[in-house]
């Protein structure tokens, strides 16, 4: 049971990694999402990835990026256009999970986003990601945050 749970968490973590890369690619190139997904699946070993979650994150974050940006803008300390591309992709993914995946504890969403930023982002981008998503979670997950205190 424990190993099955660990494997499921690892598969979701890998899905997030591939999704943030695909979101970043879309932001830079505006290539069609289905092309990004097809290329990613063809060029990578995806057998230990939660493919359904990867597909959902990639397609839904891109499809809903304007709504996600509207959630992020009030908690940013700079213009959204001034964000690094990796930071923006990570923030969009984190905002999507905070808003649409209430079954995932907000602290897990923050931790996963921090790990993505450490892996793909600049030296201190993980601190920025943490601060922005923590502020956003105060709005989207206020009851959950109050219970956690």
Swiss-Prot record:
Involved in transcription antitermination. Required for transcription of ribosomal RNA (rRNA) genes. Binds specifically to the boxA antiterminator sequence of the ribosomal RNA (rrn) operons. SUPFAM superfamilies: NusB-like. GO terms for cellular component: cytosol. InterPro entries: NusB-like_sf, NusB_fam, NusB_RsmB_TIM44. It comes from Acinetobacter baumannii (strain SDF). Belongs to the NusB family. Pfam families: NusB. This is Transcription antitermination protein NusB. Keywords: RNA-binding, Transcription, Transcription antitermination, Transcription regulation. PANTHER family: ANTITERMINATION NUSB DOMAIN-CONTAINING PROTEIN, N UTILIZATION SUBSTANCE PROTEIN B-RELATED. GO terms for biological process: DNA-templated transcription termination; transcription antitermination. The lineage of its organism: Bacteria, Pseudomonadati, Pseudomonadota, Gammaproteobacteria, Moraxellales. GO terms for molecular function: RNA binding. It comes from the Bacteria.
